[in-house]
Amino acid sequence: MSTARLFLTGIRTSGHHGANPGEKDQAQDFVVDLDVEVDVTADRIGGTSDYRELIRTAREAVERERFDLLESIADAVAEAVAARPGVVRATAVVHKPAAARSNDVDGVAAAATVEGD
């Protein structure tokens, strides 16, 4: 099998996540970066993972459920992306801009890596 890595960065989405009181009441902004290793043996779009579908899958994973931990969101995104056809491995980095601002840092993010089926 021949593989390549896709880097999909700055996927903007929103969700109801957080451990602090009130964080789940209103949707918050999240930004997802994906590093996805895909099977490219066939050299055709039908034989690998369409990056548009990977982006849609990442957004749906953030928007679908509610989590307390940023780490759990990253794991859910990586799991969902890794389950897509043609994916060998998926790493999701989920950024929470509001957490960075409230802590006076440049960024707050969590990452998770999951092997494909």
Across the structure, where does each feature detected by a protein language model lie?
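N-terminal, polar/charged subdomain of small-to-medium soluble alpha/beta proteins
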Residues: 1-117
